[in-house]
C-alpha cells in the first residue's frame, strides 16, 4: 500500500498496473533479472493506494525479501496478510466488499479471499480446485520451482499473463527478446501419471518430447 504502489508493481511485474481499473482481478508474474519467474500472482487494486496480491504461501516470504530492495526507494509498504483463499463453485458468487474479494475463474468457479476464519458457501475441496486448474493449464509457482522457468515455459504468454506493450520491468528484456526474436524451446503440457503423489514440475517435465 502507499501512493507509489502502482508504479512499483508496474516496474516489477509482467502486467500493466497503471491502467488497471479498481476491483478488477488480473493474473501476472514477478521475474528476476534473468527473466525467470519468482512468483505468479493474482492482484486486485482495491484503491489507488492499495493492492491485494494472492500468491503461493511458500514463496511469499522470499518475494517480500526480493521486493524489499525496490520498496526502500518508494512510498510503498508490503505486508504479509493471513487472509484465507477459498475455491468455490456456484452460479451466483457472493458480493465483494473491502474484506471479501471475489475472483471469477469460469462461469461457475471463483476464488474468495477473506480476512476472517469462516468459510464461505459452496467451497470445493483443494483437490477438486487443483484438478480444474490443471485442466485449464494453469502453472503455479511454489517454493521448489522459484527462479527455474521463463514465463513462456509455463505458457504465461499464451494465457494473457504477460503484457508485451506495458514497457520495462525486471526481467523484461529477456522475456521480450524471446517473444519477438525467437521461440520457446519448451512448453508446459498436460500429462496423466499413475504416481499417488506427483513431485513439483521441473525442467525435465517441460522439455519437448
Regions found by a protein language model. Give the residues of each.
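Basic, glycine/lysine-rich polyanion-binding surfaces/domains
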Residues: 1-209
